[in-house]
Amino acid sequence: MVIIGRQSAGKSTFMKVLCFCRWVEKKIMVSTDDIVNQYTHYNRFIKELKQFHRLNDEYFSKDTELLYDGDNLTIEYRGENGNAKITRKNSFAENRFNTKLCYIPAERNLISAIQNVDKTYKATERDVLFNFIYEWDEAKGPYTNEHPFRLAATGGFSYVNKSGADVLVREGGTETPAFYASSGMQSVMPMDVMANYITERVGKNASLSMHERNEINKTDNGHSYKRLEYQSAQLFIEEPEQNLYPESQKLVVMSLVRSLKKALEKGSEQSMIVVTTHSPYVMSVVNVLLAAAIVEEKNLPQSVVCKDCIISSKSISGYYIDEKGIFQNIMDNEIPMLSGNDLDGVSDWVDDSISKLNEILFA
Protein backbone atom coordinates (compact mmCIF):
# COMPACT_ATOMS: atom_id res chain seq x y z
CA MET A 1 0.00 0.00 0.00
CA VAL A 2 1.29 3.43 -1.01
CA ILE A 3 0.02 6.52 0.82
CA ILE A 4 0.59 10.02 -0.56
CA GLY A 5 -0.48 13.50 0.52
CA ARG A 6 0.85 16.88 1.52
CA GLN A 7 2.86 17.51 4.68
CA SER A 8 0.78 17.14 7.84
CA ALA A 9 -2.10 15.55 5.92
CA GLY A 10 -2.04 12.59 8.30
CA LYS A 11 -0.11 9.96 6.34
CA SER A 12 2.22 8.90 9.14
CA THR A 13 -0.52 9.26 11.76
CA PHE A 14 -2.74 6.84 9.86
CA MET A 15 0.14 4.40 9.42
CA LYS A 16 1.04 4.59 13.12
CA VAL A 17 -2.54 3.86 14.18
CA LEU A 18 -2.77 0.98 11.69
CA CYS A 19 0.54 -0.47 12.87
CA PHE A 20 -0.50 -0.22 16.52
CA CYS A 21 -3.83 -1.94 15.86
CA ARG A 22 -2.02 -4.71 13.95
CA TRP A 23 0.35 -5.09 16.91
CA VAL A 24 -2.50 -5.30 19.44
CA GLU A 25 -4.19 -7.93 17.27
CA LYS A 26 -0.94 -9.90 17.01
CA LYS A 27 -0.44 -9.74 20.77
CA ILE A 28 -3.96 -11.02 21.44
CA MET A 29 -3.66 -13.77 18.81
CA VAL A 30 -0.35 -15.06 20.17
CA SER A 31 -0.93 -14.67 23.89
CA THR A 32 -1.66 -17.77 25.95
CA ASP A 33 -3.61 -15.62 28.41
CA ASP A 34 -6.84 -13.71 27.83
CA ILE A 35 -5.37 -10.22 27.48
CA VAL A 36 -8.32 -8.57 25.71
CA ASN A 37 -9.43 -7.09 29.03
CA GLN A 38 -6.06 -5.41 29.43
CA TYR A 39 -6.72 -3.29 26.34
CA THR A 40 -10.38 -2.56 27.08
CA HIS A 41 -9.88 -1.12 30.57
CA TYR A 42 -7.99 1.73 32.27
CA ASN A 43 -7.62 3.60 28.93
CA ARG A 44 -4.67 1.34 28.17
CA PHE A 45 -5.25 1.17 24.42
CA ILE A 46 -5.11 4.91 23.86
CA LYS A 47 -2.36 5.46 26.45
CA GLU A 48 -0.02 2.96 24.78
CA LEU A 49 -0.83 4.29 21.30
CA LYS A 50 0.07 7.83 22.38
CA GLN A 51 3.19 6.76 24.25
CA PHE A 52 4.66 4.41 21.67
CA HIS A 53 4.02 6.53 18.58
CA ARG A 54 4.56 9.89 20.31
CA LEU A 55 1.07 11.26 19.69
CA ASN A 56 -0.04 13.98 22.09
CA ASP A 57 -3.58 14.95 23.12
CA GLU A 58 -3.92 17.31 20.14
CA TYR A 59 -4.29 14.30 17.84
CA PHE A 60 -7.56 13.33 19.52
CA SER A 61 -10.91 15.04 20.07
CA LYS A 62 -14.45 14.19 21.13
CA ASP A 63 -15.14 13.43 17.45
CA THR A 64 -12.26 10.94 17.09
CA GLU A 65 -13.38 7.56 15.84
CA LEU A 66 -11.12 4.56 15.14
CA LEU A 67 -12.57 1.46 13.53
CA TYR A 68 -10.17 -1.40 12.81
CA ASP A 69 -11.31 -4.56 11.04
CA GLY A 70 -8.45 -7.03 11.30
CA ASP A 71 -7.89 -10.63 10.30
CA ASN A 72 -9.38 -12.10 13.46
CA LEU A 73 -10.75 -9.26 15.57
CA THR A 74 -12.16 -5.74 15.44
CA ILE A 75 -11.19 -2.68 17.49
CA GLU A 76 -13.43 0.34 18.09
CA TYR A 77 -12.38 3.52 19.87
CA ARG A 78 -14.15 6.87 20.21
CA GLY A 79 -13.36 10.18 21.90
CA GLU A 80 -10.32 11.80 23.51
CA ASN A 81 -9.73 9.44 26.43
CA GLY A 82 -11.61 6.25 26.95
CA ASN A 83 -11.56 2.52 26.47
CA ALA A 84 -11.43 0.54 23.27
CA LYS A 85 -13.92 -2.18 22.42
CA ILE A 86 -12.23 -5.31 21.09
CA THR A 87 -14.29 -8.13 19.60
CA ARG A 88 -12.92 -11.47 18.48
CA LYS A 89 -14.34 -12.85 15.24
CA ASN A 90 -16.12 -16.21 15.28
CA SER A 91 -13.16 -17.98 13.69
CA PHE A 92 -10.60 -16.46 16.07
CA ALA A 93 -9.55 -19.67 17.85
CA GLU A 94 -8.72 -21.67 14.74
CA ASN A 95 -7.48 -18.83 12.53
CA ARG A 96 -5.20 -16.88 14.86
CA PHE A 97 -1.54 -16.76 13.88
CA ASN A 98 1.81 -15.14 14.61
CA THR A 99 3.22 -12.34 12.48
CA LYS A 100 6.41 -10.28 12.49
CA LEU A 101 5.85 -6.53 12.54
CA CYS A 102 8.21 -3.58 12.18
CA TYR A 103 7.70 0.18 12.01
CA ILE A 104 10.61 1.86 10.22
CA PRO A 105 10.51 5.57 11.12
CA ALA A 106 11.84 8.55 9.19
CA GLU A 107 14.43 8.98 11.96
CA ARG A 108 16.04 5.64 11.07
CA ASN A 109 19.28 7.31 9.98
CA LEU A 110 19.99 8.10 13.66
CA ILE A 111 21.17 4.48 13.83
CA SER A 112 24.21 5.58 11.80
CA ALA A 113 24.36 9.34 12.32
CA ILE A 114 24.79 9.15 16.10
CA GLN A 115 27.56 6.97 17.47
CA ASN A 116 26.41 4.51 20.13
CA VAL A 117 22.82 5.66 19.69
CA ASP A 118 21.62 2.68 21.69
CA LYS A 119 23.38 4.17 24.71
CA THR A 120 22.82 7.87 24.05
CA TYR A 121 19.11 7.87 23.12
CA LYS A 122 17.18 8.26 26.32
CA ALA A 123 13.43 7.80 26.44
CA THR A 124 11.44 7.92 29.66
CA GLU A 125 9.16 5.27 28.17
CA ARG A 126 9.58 2.86 25.30
CA ASP A 127 8.62 4.63 22.06
CA VAL A 128 8.83 3.86 18.34
CA LEU A 129 12.41 5.10 17.97
CA PHE A 130 13.65 3.29 21.06
CA ASN A 131 11.97 0.13 19.77
CA PHE A 132 13.55 0.50 16.32
CA ILE A 133 17.00 0.88 17.88
CA TYR A 134 16.34 -2.25 19.94
CA GLU A 135 15.11 -4.22 16.91
CA TRP A 136 18.07 -3.03 14.83
CA ASP A 137 20.43 -4.71 17.26
CA GLU A 138 18.58 -7.99 16.65
CA ALA A 139 18.20 -7.55 12.88
CA LYS A 140 21.84 -6.85 12.03
CA GLY A 141 23.15 -9.98 13.74
CA PRO A 142 23.14 -12.39 10.75
CA TYR A 143 24.96 -10.07 8.33
CA THR A 144 28.57 -10.85 9.14
CA ASN A 145 31.73 -10.90 6.98
CA GLU A 146 30.68 -14.35 5.82
CA HIS A 147 27.13 -13.20 5.02
CA PRO A 148 27.19 -9.56 3.85
CA PHE A 149 23.97 -7.97 2.65
CA ARG A 150 23.98 -6.14 -0.68
CA LEU A 151 22.23 -2.80 -0.21
CA ALA A 152 19.70 -1.44 -2.68
CA ALA A 153 21.54 1.74 -3.65
CA THR A 154 23.92 2.89 -6.33
CA GLY A 155 27.62 2.50 -5.58
CA GLY A 156 27.80 -1.23 -4.97
CA PHE A 157 27.68 -1.16 -1.15
CA SER A 158 27.13 -4.12 1.14
CA TYR A 159 26.31 -4.04 4.83
CA VAL A 160 28.45 -5.97 7.32
CA ASN A 161 28.05 -6.26 11.08
CA LYS A 162 31.61 -6.30 12.44
CA SER A 163 31.41 -7.30 16.08
CA GLY A 164 28.44 -4.98 16.57
CA ALA A 165 29.81 -2.12 14.45
CA ASP A 166 27.90 -1.11 11.31
CA VAL A 167 30.23 -1.12 8.30
CA LEU A 168 29.63 -0.46 4.60
CA VAL A 169 31.85 -2.37 2.19
CA ARG A 170 32.34 -1.39 -1.45
CA GLU A 171 32.77 -3.96 -4.21
CA GLY A 172 36.52 -3.34 -4.18
CA GLY A 173 36.71 -4.15 -0.48
CA THR A 174 37.01 -0.60 0.86
CA GLU A 175 35.32 -0.32 4.25
CA THR A 176 33.53 2.73 5.64
CA PRO A 177 31.96 2.89 9.11
CA ALA A 178 28.29 3.80 8.73
CA PHE A 179 28.88 6.87 10.92
CA TYR A 180 31.02 8.39 8.15
CA ALA A 181 28.80 7.33 5.24
CA SER A 182 26.64 9.64 3.13
CA SER A 183 23.17 10.63 4.35
CA GLY A 184 21.63 8.44 1.65
CA MET A 185 23.50 5.35 2.78
CA GLN A 186 22.69 6.14 6.41
CA SER A 187 19.00 6.17 5.47
CA VAL A 188 18.91 3.13 3.20
CA MET A 189 21.09 0.85 5.35
CA PRO A 190 18.75 0.31 8.34
CA MET A 191 15.64 0.23 6.14
CA ASP A 192 16.95 -2.30 3.62
CA VAL A 193 18.60 -4.56 6.20
CA MET A 194 15.57 -4.46 8.50
CA ALA A 195 13.12 -5.21 5.68
CA ASN A 196 15.20 -8.18 4.57
CA TYR A 197 15.55 -9.52 8.11
CA ILE A 198 11.87 -9.16 9.00
CA THR A 199 10.63 -10.85 5.83
CA GLU A 200 13.22 -13.63 6.17
CA ARG A 201 11.69 -14.52 9.54
CA VAL A 202 8.49 -15.78 7.90
CA GLY A 203 8.25 -19.54 8.27
CA LYS A 204 10.76 -19.60 11.13
CA ASN A 205 10.29 -20.10 14.86
CA ALA A 206 8.79 -17.10 16.63
CA SER A 207 10.38 -15.49 19.67
CA LEU A 208 8.47 -17.24 22.44
CA SER A 209 9.39 -18.56 25.86
CA MET A 210 9.34 -22.29 26.55
CA HIS A 211 6.30 -21.79 28.77
CA GLU A 212 4.44 -20.02 25.96
CA ARG A 213 5.34 -22.77 23.50
CA ASN A 214 4.10 -25.46 25.86
CA GLU A 215 0.84 -23.61 26.51
CA ILE A 216 0.22 -23.09 22.79
CA ASN A 217 0.85 -26.77 22.06
CA LYS A 218 -1.70 -27.69 24.76
CA THR A 219 -4.51 -25.49 23.54
CA ASP A 220 -4.30 -25.08 19.77
CA ASN A 221 -5.67 -28.47 18.65
CA GLY A 222 -3.53 -28.95 15.56
CA HIS A 223 -3.17 -25.26 14.75
CA SER A 224 -0.22 -24.58 17.05
CA TYR A 225 2.31 -24.13 14.24
CA LYS A 226 0.51 -20.95 13.16
CA ARG A 227 1.47 -19.33 16.45
CA LEU A 228 4.82 -21.03 16.95
CA GLU A 229 6.14 -19.85 13.57
CA TYR A 230 5.79 -16.47 11.88
CA GLN A 231 3.12 -16.75 9.19
CA SER A 232 3.57 -13.29 7.70
CA ALA A 233 5.58 -10.06 7.83
CA GLN A 234 4.16 -6.55 8.10
CA LEU A 235 6.34 -3.51 7.44
CA PHE A 236 5.38 0.13 7.89
CA ILE A 237 7.93 2.48 6.30
CA GLU A 238 8.08 6.26 6.37
CA GLU A 239 9.45 7.85 3.19
CA PRO A 240 11.64 5.10 1.69
CA GLU A 241 13.07 7.70 -0.73
CA GLN A 242 14.66 9.69 2.08
CA ASN A 243 18.01 11.25 0.97
CA LEU A 244 18.23 9.00 -2.08
CA TYR A 245 19.05 9.68 -5.73
CA PRO A 246 16.22 8.61 -8.11
CA GLU A 247 18.15 5.53 -9.31
CA SER A 248 18.59 4.40 -5.71
CA GLN A 249 14.90 5.04 -5.04
CA LYS A 250 14.11 2.60 -7.84
CA LEU A 251 16.46 0.00 -6.39
CA VAL A 252 14.95 0.42 -2.91
CA VAL A 253 11.38 -0.09 -4.10
CA MET A 254 12.37 -3.19 -6.06
CA SER A 255 14.29 -4.56 -3.08
CA LEU A 256 11.29 -4.05 -0.79
CA VAL A 257 8.96 -5.79 -3.23
CA ARG A 258 11.48 -8.61 -3.68
CA SER A 259 11.55 -9.14 0.10
CA LEU A 260 7.76 -8.97 0.27
CA LYS A 261 7.41 -11.61 -2.44
CA LYS A 262 9.61 -14.03 -0.49
CA ALA A 263 7.46 -13.52 2.59
CA LEU A 264 4.25 -14.05 0.61
CA GLU A 265 5.60 -17.31 -0.79
CA LYS A 266 6.70 -18.67 2.60
CA GLY A 267 3.79 -17.60 4.79
CA SER A 268 0.28 -18.96 5.16
CA GLU A 269 -1.07 -15.46 5.85
CA GLN A 270 -0.93 -12.20 3.91
CA SER A 271 2.29 -10.21 4.29
CA MET A 272 2.25 -6.50 3.48
CA ILE A 273 4.31 -3.33 3.21
CA VAL A 274 2.77 0.09 3.81
CA VAL A 275 4.80 3.16 2.77
CA THR A 276 4.24 6.89 2.91
CA THR A 277 5.96 8.89 0.19
CA HIS A 278 6.32 12.27 -1.49
CA SER A 279 8.38 10.84 -4.34
CA PRO A 280 7.08 10.65 -7.93
CA TYR A 281 9.91 8.19 -8.60
CA VAL A 282 8.60 5.76 -5.99
CA MET A 283 5.15 6.00 -7.54
CA SER A 284 6.53 5.48 -11.04
CA VAL A 285 8.46 2.36 -10.05
CA VAL A 286 5.38 0.91 -8.34
CA ASN A 287 3.43 1.52 -11.54
CA VAL A 288 6.06 -0.31 -13.59
CA LEU A 289 5.80 -3.28 -11.21
CA LEU A 290 2.02 -3.12 -11.42
CA ALA A 291 2.14 -3.21 -15.23
CA ALA A 292 4.59 -6.12 -15.11
CA ALA A 293 2.26 -8.01 -12.76
CA ILE A 294 -0.65 -7.61 -15.17
CA VAL A 295 1.49 -8.80 -18.09
CA GLU A 296 2.47 -11.90 -16.07
CA GLU A 297 -1.14 -12.57 -15.09
CA LYS A 298 -2.10 -12.55 -18.77
CA ASN A 299 0.67 -15.12 -19.40
CA LEU A 300 2.40 -12.80 -21.85
CA PRO A 301 6.19 -13.04 -22.26
CA GLN A 302 8.23 -10.14 -20.86
CA SER A 303 11.86 -9.54 -19.92
CA VAL A 304 11.52 -5.94 -18.71
CA VAL A 305 11.15 -6.66 -15.00
CA CYS A 306 12.74 -9.52 -13.03
CA LYS A 307 10.18 -12.07 -11.90
CA ASP A 308 11.45 -11.90 -8.32
CA CYS A 309 10.08 -8.32 -8.16
CA ILE A 310 6.60 -9.16 -9.43
CA ILE A 311 3.72 -9.76 -7.03
CA SER A 312 -0.02 -10.03 -7.66
CA SER A 313 -1.54 -6.86 -9.09
CA LYS A 314 -4.29 -7.20 -6.48
CA SER A 315 -1.65 -6.76 -3.77
CA ILE A 316 -0.86 -3.22 -4.95
CA SER A 317 -2.96 -0.27 -3.80
CA GLY A 318 -2.61 3.45 -3.28
CA TYR A 319 -4.40 6.28 -1.51
CA TYR A 320 -4.19 10.06 -1.45
CA ILE A 321 -5.09 11.92 1.76
CA ASP A 322 -6.54 15.29 0.82
CA GLU A 323 -6.46 18.54 2.79
CA LYS A 324 -9.60 17.48 4.71
CA GLY A 325 -8.02 14.18 5.73
CA ILE A 326 -10.24 12.15 3.41
CA PHE A 327 -8.78 9.07 1.70
CA GLN A 328 -9.10 8.86 -2.06
CA ASN A 329 -8.34 5.65 -3.94
CA ILE A 330 -5.77 6.55 -6.62
CA MET A 331 -5.90 3.23 -8.46
CA ASP A 332 -7.09 3.75 -12.03
CA ASN A 333 -8.56 0.37 -12.90
CA GLU A 334 -8.95 1.16 -16.59
CA ILE A 335 -5.25 1.66 -17.34
CA PRO A 336 -4.43 0.32 -14.57
CA MET A 337 -1.97 2.43 -12.57
CA LEU A 338 -1.67 4.55 -9.45
CA SER A 339 -2.36 8.17 -10.32
CA GLY A 340 0.39 10.55 -9.29
CA ASN A 341 -1.49 13.72 -10.23
CA ASP A 342 -1.98 14.71 -6.60
CA LEU A 343 1.71 14.13 -5.92
CA ASP A 344 2.98 16.48 -8.60
CA GLY A 345 1.37 19.87 -8.27
CA VAL A 346 4.53 21.68 -9.35
CA SER A 347 5.00 20.60 -12.99
CA ASP A 348 2.08 22.67 -14.28
CA TRP A 349 3.42 25.72 -12.45
CA VAL A 350 6.92 25.11 -13.86
CA ASP A 351 5.64 24.73 -17.44
CA ASP A 352 3.46 27.82 -17.17
CA SER A 353 6.20 29.92 -15.57
CA ILE A 354 8.87 28.87 -18.09
CA SER A 355 6.49 29.61 -20.96
CA LYS A 356 5.74 33.11 -19.67
CA LEU A 357 9.41 33.87 -18.94
CA ASN A 358 10.44 32.65 -22.41
CA GLU A 359 7.86 34.96 -23.93
CA ILE A 360 9.49 37.85 -22.09
CA LEU A 361 13.03 36.75 -23.03
CA PHE A 362 12.35 36.15 -26.70
CA ALA A 363 9.64 38.72 -27.37
Where are these regions (language model features)?
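Phosphate-binding glycine-rich loops of NTP-binding sites
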Residues: V2-I46, S183-I198, M254-S255, M272, ...
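Phosphate-coordinating catalytic segments in nucleotide- and nucleic-acid-processing enzymes
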Residues: R22-I237, K307-S313, S317, K324-A363
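Short, surface-exposed basic-aromatic patches at helix termini and helix-loop junctions that form
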Residues: S91-R96, V257-K261, A291-A292
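Helical segment within the ABC ATPase nucleotide-binding domain
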Residues: S224, K250-K266
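Loop/turn-to-beta-strand initiation segments
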Residues: S232, E269-V274
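Conserved Walker B
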Residues: P240-Q242
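Conserved D-loop-proximal element of ABC-family nucleotide-binding domains
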Residues: Y245-P246
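Conserved catalytic segment of ABC-fold P-loop ATPases
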Residues: M272, S284-Y319
